[in-house]
Amino acid sequence: MFGVLNSSDHRAAVQQRNIPAFGRTSFELWTDNPTSNYRCETGGNGRDSGQNRVRRPMNAFMVWSRDQRRRVALENPQMQNSEISKQLGYQWKMLTEAEKWPFFEEAQRLQAMHREKYPDYKYRPRRKALPQNSDKLLPAASSSMLCRQVLVDEKWCPFTYRDSCSRAAHPRMEDQLSSSQPVNIANSLLQQEHHYCSTSLRDSPETLAMHLSADPPFYPK
């Protein structure tokens, strides 16, 4: 029932089965995968390629500029496409209604043919990507929280180093408020801080001694 394989045939079959994948061409590797074949036919990741995408029917200006653009490009090889479009747009505006009418008729004929060929066609314009703004201003909520944090931190500073703390905190608070808060709000906060410092100066010596003994010394950088 079973045929006897020669040693040479068996060796050739084993070598054919043990051929590594990197020894084969990329075309053979792609054609063995049905998913890859579908990707090749549709162009990329399974979506329709630009060639299979249905284009909009031409309007009257596009019908007129189709030949005019080619003529201007041949006459001015160094002219860019944007400059050619501007020139064609200006020339189209200078035409009279009688001169434009044949191109409107041709555009209507092309649109009728397009509707017959693609009855379910709907124009879907591509959305432009929004630019990401990297430089954003500090929100008002975060700036107010920063001011409250600065005031709370200064309350824990000893009396002997309060002047240095206020001098270090006031420029930072003013810089944050200048970009997000009005000037009058910054002035009111500074006045509140000065009032707090002046009231602490009128404390009794016993209260000051208690604060100095309870709080650890603060060494400004």
From Swiss-Prot:
Keywords assigned: Activator, Calmodulin-binding, Cytoplasm, Differentiation, DNA-binding, Nucleus, Sexual differentiation, Transcription, Transcription regulation
DNA-binding region, residue intervals: 54-122
Primary localization: nucleus
Gene Ontology molecular functions: calmodulin binding; DNA-binding transcription activator activity, RNA polymerase II-specific; RNA polymerase II cis-regulatory region sequence-specific DNA binding
SUPFAM superfamilies referenced in this protein's UniProt entry, alphabetically: HMG-box
Protein origin, superkingdom: Eukaryota
A GO-annotated cellular component: cytoplasm
Subcellular location: Nucleus speckle; Cytoplasm; Nucleus
Entry-linked PROSITE patterns: HMG_BOX_2
Pfam families given in the database record: HMG_box
GO biological process: cell differentiation; male sex determination; sex differentiation
InterPro entries: HMG_box_dom, HMG_box_dom_sf, SRY, SRY-related_HMG-box_TF-like
Family: Belongs to the SRY family.
Assembly mode: Interacts with CALM, EP300, HDAC3, KPNB1, ZNF208 isoform KRAB-O, PARP1, SLC9A3R2 and WT1. The interaction with EP300 modulates its DNA-binding activity. The interaction with KPNB1 is sensitive to dissociation by Ran in the GTP-bound form. Interaction with PARP1 impaired its DNA-binding activity.
Task of the protein: Transcriptional regulator that controls a genetic switch in male development. It is necessary and sufficient for initiating male sex determination by directing the development of supporting cell precursors (pre-Sertoli cells) as Sertoli rather than granulosa cells. Involved in different aspects of gene regulation including promoter activation or repression. Binds to the DNA consensus sequence 5'-[AT]AACAA[AT]-3'. SRY HMG box recognizes DNA by partial intercalation in the minor groove and promotes DNA bending. Also involved in pre-mRNA splicing.
Name assigned to this protein: Sex-determining region Y protein
Organism: Hydrurga leptonyx (Leopard seal)
